[in-house]
C-alpha cells in the first residue's frame, strides 16, 4: 500500500455567514450552527470528531449526495464539513475554511505483488503517482 495524499476535512459556509470572517473554524463553532450532514451512517468522520469532544451538532438536513449539500449551503440552508477532494472545483459561491481538531483521511492505492501485476496495472499506478498531485493542486 502507498499513501498518495492526506485529504483534509473543511468547513463549507455560505459567503454571508458569520463564521466566514474566521480563518479557521473549530468543531465547537460548527456544532452551534444549522448543519447539513452527509449521511454516511455510523461511519461519519465529522460526527465521530464531534462526539469525541462531546459536541452534538444541530443537524437540519441529512443528505446522501455531496453536490446537493454544496447547493444547499450556497442557498444559506446551513453549513457543512466536506473533504477537500470533493470541493475541488466547486468553491464558487462558498467560503471554505480549515477545521481545527479534525482528522484527515489517507488516500491510498494498494496492490498485492508488483512483480506479478499486469503491465496495465503498473502503468495505472505510475500514472496516479505522477498525476494525482497535479490534479489536487488544480
Report the location of each language-model feature.
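A local structural motif
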Residues: 51-60, 94
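Short beta-strand-to-loop elements that line the ligand-binding cleft
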Residues: 37, 56-65
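Short beta-strand-centered segments that line the small-molecule binding cleft or hinge
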Residues: 1-9, 13, 49, 69, ...
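A late-sequence structural motif
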Residues: 95-137
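Short acidic active-site motifs
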Residues: 26, 45, 67-68
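Secondary-structure junction motif
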Residues: 33-53, 117-122, 135
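Paired acidic/hydrophobic, glycine-rich loop segments that form the ligand-binding mouth/hinge
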Residues: 78-83
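Flexible hinge/capping segments at coil-to-helix
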Residues: 1-9, 13-35
Amino acid at each position: 500500500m502507498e499513501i498518495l495524499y492526506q485529504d483534509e476535512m473543511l468547513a463549507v459556509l455560505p459567503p454571508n455567514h458569520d463564521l466566514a470572517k474566521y480563518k479557521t473554524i473549530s468543531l465547537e463553532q460548527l456544532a452551534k450552527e444549522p448543519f447539513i450532514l452527509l449521511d454516511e451512517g455510523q461511519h461519519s468522520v465529522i460526527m465521530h470528531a464531534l462526539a469525541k469532544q462531546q459536541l452534538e451538532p444541530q443537524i437540519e438536513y441529512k443528505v446522501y449526495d455531496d453536490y446537493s449539500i454544496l447547493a444547499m449551503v450556497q442557498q444559506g440552508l446551513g453549513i457543512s464539513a466536506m473533504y477537500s477532494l470533493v470541493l475541488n472545483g466547486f468553491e464558487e459561491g462558498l467560503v471554505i475554511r480549515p477545521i481545527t481538531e479534525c482528522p484527515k483521511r489517507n488516500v491510498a492505492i494498494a496492490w498485492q505483488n508488483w512483480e506479478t501485476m499486469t503491465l496495465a496495472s503498473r502503468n495505472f499506478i505510475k500514472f496516479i503517482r505522477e498525476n494525482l498531485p497535479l490534479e489536487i493542486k488544480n
